[in-house]
Amino acid sequence: MEPSPLELPVDAVRRIAAELNCDPTDERVALRLDEEDKLSHFRNCFYIPKMRDLPSIDLSLVSEDDDAIYFLGNSLGLQPKMVRTYLEEELDKWAKMGAYGHDVGKRPWIVGDESIVSLMKDIVGAHEKEIALMNALTINLHLLLLSFFKPTPKRHKILLEAKAFPSDHYAIESQIQLHGLDVEKSMRMVKPREGEETLRMEDILEVIEEEGDSIAVILFSGLHFYTGQLFNIPAITKAGHAKGCFVGFDLAHAVGNVELRLHDWGVDFACWCSYKYLNSGAGGLAGAFVHEKHAHTVKPALVGWFGHDLSTRFNMDNKLQLIPGANGFRISNPPILLVCSLHASLEVFQQATMTALRRKSILLTGYLEYMLKHYHSKDNTENKGPIVNIITPSRAEERGCQLTLTFSIPKKSVFKELEKRGVVCDKREPDGIRVAPVPLYNSFHDVYKFIRLLTSILDSSERS
């Protein structure tokens, strides 16, 4: 029976349990969800780490040939199997023809980045000419802020969320200092209310309305790295524009995780990395977006050879013919080996589509949430053991695939025991463990096994 597009995860779980005449927490529910999953075959496009290869594993607790339970795609995505093939293609080309590789093959090196932009446009919801694939995320953020942050005595602030990812915080702080401004006065952070972990949308909009005339740039995460909160990008953009602000986003934890419509939402600029949900490998090629409305008005503050139009680039006359829009921000030759790894992943996304992946993700993370609450919620009167609290918003439209968990016992001991059993997740200060079932390669049975292991760990801690 095909689930309704509007069916809530909890309803889907209960529906299947009723069909199977079993409890919603039964393993058969997870197996049926996997049977109904039309995206399950994409798992075969990735290398899944084996238990025996994990550094913290206790082989007395697991079968060494089993797949790990990999819930860390929010930090580093798994390797697409085609990466090695694409890398070898370019290494062979280099070995066999040297510099001729710049101009021939399916990825001519001189336009290597441009050869895969078409695969990125639907993931971020942008036109090809609005996207540049280059550098690393924070470098791109600096380049964009140099062009969009033009403070005046009246409009000099950058607005961001409190406890933004440190690299964003440092970048904004240093940009403010670069202009000789006082960080205390020009760096405006929106904080959660007392006793709350996440930001309320009304509080963000209130700050924009009340202080917008003094804000030059609003720069938020699309999705917060710690709490997993997905911000309302179109609403923030609309509110910022109403007050005359430029609005940009760091999409590190949003790209490849949730559906984006950067062009339609009118976002001024954005940047992202590609090694998390986009599976391009550590330090993979990052991306930048500049809305086409700024193509001829907002120009890069720093330029290089690859911002010059290719048709006249080799005239060598030192007369800059700047490419309008995002591609004008490119400075240097694209790193073709990084292009290869990103290419391998983006092809999988093109086949799966973000719409289908997001639909599965809502159900997958919803199933995880249901199971956590069933066994370990403080609201479950039958739960006499340690409590698991989910600080990530419960509404699907306010989160991606990640849930951030806190515990009534020290997280360090929980994390260590999970590692021993082949669960790959991470801990983040002050007290969270981040768990991210990724729809491209994680299964509902992964979630079921994780819950079984976590329950066993918590039960053991209670007995000891």
Swiss-Prot record:
Signal peptide annotation: none
InterPro entries linked to this entry: Kynureninase, PyrdxlP-dep_Trfase, PyrdxlP-dep_Trfase_major, PyrdxlP-dep_Trfase_small
Co-factor(s): pyridoxal 5'-phosphate
Catalytic reaction equation(s): L-kynurenine + H2O = anthranilate + L-alanine + H(+); 3-hydroxy-L-kynurenine + H2O = 3-hydroxyanthranilate + L-alanine + H(+)
GO biological process terms on file: 'de novo' NAD biosynthetic process from L-tryptophan; anthranilate metabolic process; L-kynurenine catabolic process; L-tryptophan catabolic process; NAD biosynthetic process; quinolinate biosynthetic process; response to type II interferon; response to vitamin B6
Enzyme superclass (EC): hydrolase
Residues the record lists as binding pyridoxal 5'-phosphate: 137-138, 165-168, 221, 250, 253, 275, 305, 333
Molecular functions (GO terms): kynureninase activity; protein homodimerization activity; pyridoxal phosphate binding
EC number: 3.7.1.3
N-acetylmethionine: residues bearing it: 1
Recorded metabolic or biological pathway in which this protein acts: Amino-acid degradation; L-kynurenine degradation; L-alanine and anthranilate from L-kynurenine: step 1/1; Cofactor biosynthesis; NAD(+) biosynthesis; quinolinate from L-kynurenine: step 2/3
GO cellular component: cytosol; mitochondrion; nucleoplasm
UniProt keyword terms in alphabetical order: Acetylation, Cytoplasm, Hydrolase, Pyridine nucleotide biosynthesis, Pyridoxal phosphate
Modified residues (N6-(pyridoxal phosphate)lysine): 276
Loss of function: phenotype: No visible phenotype. Mice were born at the expected Mendelian ratio and are normal. They however show very high levels of L-3-hydroxykynurenine compared to wild-type mice.
UniProt-annotated location(s): Cytoplasm, Cytosol
PANTHER family according to UniProt: KYNURENINASE
Similarity field: Belongs to the kynureninase family.
Primary role: Catalyzes the cleavage of L-kynurenine (L-Kyn) and L-3-hydroxykynurenine (L-3OHKyn) into anthranilic acid (AA) and 3-hydroxyanthranilic acid (3-OHAA), respectively. Has a preference for the L-3-hydroxy form. Also has cysteine-conjugate-beta-lyase activity.
Subunit and interaction comment: Homodimer.
Record's protein name: Kynureninase
Annotated organism of origin: Mus musculus (Mouse)
